[in-house]
Amino acid sequence: MSRQSLTKAHAKISELTWEPTFATPATRFGTDYTFEKAPKKDPLKQIMRSYFSMEEEKDNRVYGAMDGAIRGNMFRQVQQRWLEWQKLFLSIIPFPEISAARAMPMAIDAVPNPEIHNGLAVQMIDEVRHSTIQMNLKKLYMNNYIDPAGFDMTEKAFANNYAGTIGRQFGEGFITGDAITAANIYLTVVAETAFTNTLFVAMPDEAAANGDYLLPTVFHSVQSDESRHISNGYSILLMALADERNRPLLERDLRYAWWNNHCVVDAAIGTFIEYGTKDRRKDRESYAEMWRRWIYDDYYRSYLLPLEKYGLTIPHDLVEEAWKRIVEKGYVHEVARFFATGWPVNYWRIDTMTDTDFEWFEHKYPGWYNKFGKWWENYNRLAYPGRNKPIAFEEVGYQYPHRCWTCMVPALIREDMIVEKVDGQWRTYCSETCYWTDAVAFRGEYEGRATPNMGRLTGFREWETLHHGKDLADIVTDLGYVRDDGKTLVGQPHLDLDPQKMWTLDDVRGNTFNSPNVLLNQMTNDERDAHVAAYRAGGVPA
C-alpha cells in the first residue's frame, strides 16, 4: 500500500465516525474530565498497513509453540512448583484482559476524538486476542500437566477464592467508575505502561528458567501489543492535559492507580516469581531487582517524571513507598506467607521450602530468615496430615490478617494498617493511601468539585466475611475445592501426590474459621483499640 493510499484509507475510516450536530448524544459511560480544548491525534495510522497480518503471524507462532511443547515433552521437564502457581495466575489474568477489552467502548464514548477511536477499537481486538491465547494456554496445561486439579475449575474458583477475588477487583477497576479514570489512567497509563513489564517480561523469564517455554511465548506475544496501547493512553493523557480543569483529577487518579497496581500486581507477580521458582542461582535477579529495573527505571524515571514538565504533580512519595515496602518491609514475602497460610482453601498446591531456598532468600534479602524462616520451617513440619491441624490453626506465631477494604490484599505490613469507620462500618486498610482512595478519591466530590462519576467501593469486599463462623471442611466443600474422589482437597501444603500424604475433608474438619473484620466490628471501642495496637505491633499468635 502506497503512502498516498494509506492516507486515503485512514481518512475513509475516520469518516465512518458519526458526530451528531443537531442533538446531544446520550452519555453511556460518564466522566468528570473535560476535553473541549483537546488536540486530536491518531496513533493507529502508523500501523494500519500491517496490523492484521502482524497479529496473524503472532497467533501462528503461539499455537505452533503449543504444538511443539507437547511433541517435545515439555511437561516432563517443567517444575511442578512453578506450574502450581500458574493455576492461580492463569485463572486471574484472562479477566483483566477481557475487562480491558470492555473498557475500550468506555474510552471511545468518553473521548471526543474520532481520530483516536480507531486505535481504541484495535486495542479492543488485541485484548480479546490476549484473553483467548491465555485461556488456551491454561487448557493446554490442564490437559498435559501431571495434576490437572485446579486448572479444571479456574473460572469458578477465580470468582470465589480469597486470592482470585483480589485479581477480580483489579480487573473490575478497568470498567467501573469514571470512564477516563478506569479505562485510561488506571488501565493504560499505569497498568499497561508500568506493570506489564513485570507481568509479561520478567515473569516469562522466570518461566523459562523453570522449564516452561510456553508461557514466555504467549506473554511475549501479548507484550508486543502493549506499545500501541501505551500510545493510546498517552494520547488521551495529553488531550486531558490540554485543559487545566483536568489536572486535579489526573493527579488524584495517578495516585490511586499507581498504588492499587502496586498493591495487587507486586503482591501476585512477586510471589509467583520468588516462591514459584526452583532456580536459585545467586546471580538470578530477585523481584526487587526486577522491579528496580522494569518499574523504577523504565517507567517512573522514563515515563512519569517527564510529565512534570506539563505541570503535573507526580506521586514520588508513593513510588518510593512501594519500593520501601518491597525491599525493607518484606511485602512480597508477607503475601507468600499469607497464601501458604490459606492453603486449605487454595485450588493450587504450595511447595515446601528447602535449605537452598532459605539460602537464596537470605542472600537476596538479608534478614529474611529472622523474619520468615521459622514460619516456613513450621510450614514444612506441618505439611502432612495425621498429627496436626493446618498451619492456620496451629500455634506458629502468626495472626490471620485483616483484609484491606480498597485493594483487598490483607494488611500484611501490620504497622501500616489503618482502621477507620467509613459509611457506618469499621474498615481496615493496608495503608494510608488505600484509606484515602476509599474515603476521599471514590466520592461524589473531590476538592470542592462534583465528581458524580467516580462511584463507590462497595459490596462484599472481605472474603472472610462470607465464611465467618463456618467449619473449614464446610468452606472447602462449599467452594468446590475437592478432588474427584469426593474427599481429597485440591490445595495441599506440599507437592507429594501420594494419596496417603494428601489432606482430606476429614483432616480439616473441626476447625472454625472466623473473619477478623466481623470480629472487629463486634468489639467495644476499648477492645478495638487494644486489638489494633497489638496487631500493629506485630500481631499475636493465632
From Swiss-Prot:
Enzyme class: oxidoreductase
Source taxon at top rank: Bacteria
Keywords: Iron, Metal-binding, Monooxygenase, NAD, Oxidoreductase
Catalytic activity: propane + NADH + O2 + H(+) = propan-2-ol + NAD(+) + H2O; acetone + NADH + O2 + H(+) = hydroxyacetone + NAD(+) + H2O; butan-2-one + NADH + O2 + H(+) = 1-hydroxy-2-butanone + NAD(+) + H2O; phenol + NADH + O2 + H(+) = hydroquinone + NAD(+) + H2O
InterPro entries, A to Z: Ferritin-like_SF (IPR009078), Phenol_Hydrox (IPR003430), RNR-like (IPR012348)
Entry-linked Gene3D superfamilies: Ribonucleotide Reductase, subunit A
Induction pattern: By acetone. Transcriptionally activated by MimR.
UniProt binding sites for Fe cation 2: 127, 192, 226, 229
EC number in record: 1.14.13.227
Pfam families: Phenol_Hydrox
Molecular function terms from GO: metal ion binding; monooxygenase activity
Alphabetized SUPFAM superfamilies for the sequence: Ferritin-like (SSF47240)
Annotated residues for binding of Fe cation 1: 97, 127, 130, 226
Cofactor annotation comment: Binds 2 Fe(2+) ions per subunit.
Known function: Component of the propane 2-monooxygenase multicomponent enzyme system which is involved in the degradation of propane via the O2-dependent hydroxylation of propane. Also involved in the degradation of acetone via the O2-dependent hydroxylation of acetone. Also able to catalyze the oxidation of phenol, methylethylketone (2-butanone), 1-propanol and 2-propanol.
Subunit structure: The propane 2-monooxygenase multicomponent enzyme system is composed of an electron transfer component and a monooxygenase component interacting with the effector protein MimD. The electron transfer component is composed of a reductase (MimB), and the monooxygenase component is formed by a large subunit (MimA) and a small subunit (MimC). Requires the presence of the chaperonin-like protein MimG to ensure a productive folding, resulting of a soluble MimA, which leads to the active form of MimABCD.
Homology family: Belongs to the TmoA/XamoA family.
Protein name: Propane 2-monooxygenase, hydroxylase component large subunit
